[in-house]
Swiss-Prot record:
HAMAP family: tRNA_Ile_lys_synt. Its main location: cytoplasm. ATP binds at residues 27-32. One of its GO terms (biological process) is tRNA modification. This is tRNA(Ile)-lysidine synthase. The N-terminal region contains the highly conserved SGGXDS motif, predicted to be a P-loop motif involved in ATP binding. Its EC number is 6.3.4.19. It comes from Rickettsia typhi (strain ATCC VR-144 / Wilmington).
Length: 430
């Protein structure tokens, strides 16, 4: 019965992809171990190569045992297993969020190397209920309260085929088939708000969780049927994103959309332009929406971005000064800099560094820069935007600023594209 439910889910979620490969994230807990066995049956039935991935966060001694166990299962199932390691660098600030981001970075990068398009994760019905309660507690809007069984990360499709299966069914499946799993002791700690909510829900009657699930489904339906199409339409109609890493929002077109969608558009642009992975809080977006409604020009900094109104348009570009991007050595053919730009070299060069333009360097090359095109596109905000662009240096000398076709020598040839590592449950643009 459980497998039939799983099979129906995954076939609907995968659709007509015509997959020959698929990957699965396994931690050693009951949820992911059950998913592994279910996915293995499905993969065998459909002649699909299954890759098993685990990530050691190097925080618990037990994780080594879990990884050995997953490797043992993988060997028995004759599946390829990859054990990845997350380096927390002894920085325990905001660790849960950083570990999650690091985990997905590692897994999706491996998927790209393996030419795998889909990664399965073991989020089940109880997880969705807990998430809904957590977000409700944080006063999330309707987009925040919604959940998705499919989303994208690093151009890999993340699929959750256990979304309507309670944890109790997964545990029962493992017990019936005498399959071992590990309990993560951190799930018992009241240090995490999720665990407290989980314990409260455990004490409630089943109908309470059922009612929450119904509300979740209603929210999801509203998003899918009405608000998500409106959001995609709004982005297409009102937003212009430029290769220089800034954007203009047409406020006349923006005004016709619902408030929920307006919040999401601003959030969408702030994440993309800032290069950050986290969303802006509603309390930081609300004042911007209020200023927009007042029809006055303004200039504000929010979420690592400068937002300025110019008549009926909103210009958003990256804020520089407080948090400068790290320099990167261009060792391979291409590199991502500032989580926003992809720089590619088209010739062999000595080790060069991708960094930002300093005032000292600007003074040296100022008279050689042609900023007319950038000036026209950005409504005379070219000087501020120039300092947000990647430059290429060799031995402390600026040899190229590809965006404005500045090269100190004809032998250099670099390509640059605006390619933010943008993550959204509602939109995806490759």
């Amino acid at each position: 019965m459980l497998y039939e439910k799983f099979e129906y889910n995954i076939n609907n979620l995968v659709g007509n992809f015509g997959l020959s490969k698929i990957a699965i994230a396994v931690s050693g807990g009951s949820d992911s171990v059950a998913l592994l066995y279910l996915a293995n049956i499905w993969a065998e039935k459909n002649n699909i190569e299954l890759f098993i991935i685990s990530v050691d966060h190097n925080l618990r001694a037990q994780s080594k045992q879990e990884n050995y166990y997953i490797q043992s299962i993988s060997n028995n199932l004759k599946r390829k297993y990859y054990n990845l390691s997350f380096d927390h660098q002894n920085n325990f600030s905001n660790l849960q969020a950083r570990a999650r981001e690091g985990r997905y970075d590692l897994m999706t990068n491996l998927c790209l190397e393996l030419d795998v398009l889909v990664l399965l994760t073991a989020h089940h019905e109880d997880d969705y209920v807990e998430n809904f309660c957590l977000r409700l507690e944080r006063n999330s809007g309707i987009f925040g309260l919604s959940s998705s069984n499919i989303h994208w990360y690093n151009n890999i499709q993340i699929i959750r085929p256990l979304y309507n299966i309670p944890k109790s069914e997964l545990v029962k499946y493992l017990v019936t088939n005498k399959i071992k799993w590990f309990e993560d002791e951190s799930n018992l700690s009241d240090k995490y708000r999720r665990n407290i909510i989980r314990q409260k829900l455990f004490k409630e009657e089943n109908y309470i969780k059922a009612e929450i699930s119904v509300q979740q489904l209603k929210t999801n339906k509203l998003i899918e049927d009405e608000l998500k199409p409106e959001l995609i339409s709004a982005i297409g109609e009102a937003v212009k994103i430029f290769e220089y890493g800034f954007t203009f929002l047409d406020l006349v077109k923006f005004d016709k959309f619902s408030n929920e969608v307006k919040v999401q558009i601003i959030n969408f642009l702030l994440i993309m332009i800032s290069g950050q992975s986290r969303s802006a809080r509603f309390y930081s977006i609300a004042p911007i929406l209020k200023l927009i409604s007042q029809n006055v020009n303004f200039k504000k900094t929010v979420h690592g971005c400068v937002i300025t109104r110019i008549q009926n348009e909103l210009l958003i570009y990256r804020e520089f000064g407080k948090k400068l991007p790290k320099s990167k050595i261009l060792l391979d053919k291409s590199v991502i800099w500032d989580n926003r730009f992809c720089i590619t070299k088209n010739q062999e060069t000595p080790d060069c560094v991708i960094t930002y333009l300093s005032l000292e360097d600007y003074k040296v090359i100022k008279k050689q820069l042609d900023l007319k095109h950038l000036k026209n596109l950005s409504c005379k905000n070219h000087n501020a935007i120039l300092f947000t662009l990647p430059i290429i240096k060799i031995l402390e000398k600026v040899i190229a600023i590809p965006h404005i076709s500045y090269y100190d020598n004809d032998m250099w040839n670099f390509e640059v594209s605006f390619a933010p590592n943008f993550v959204s449950r509602f939109t995806h643009f490759c």
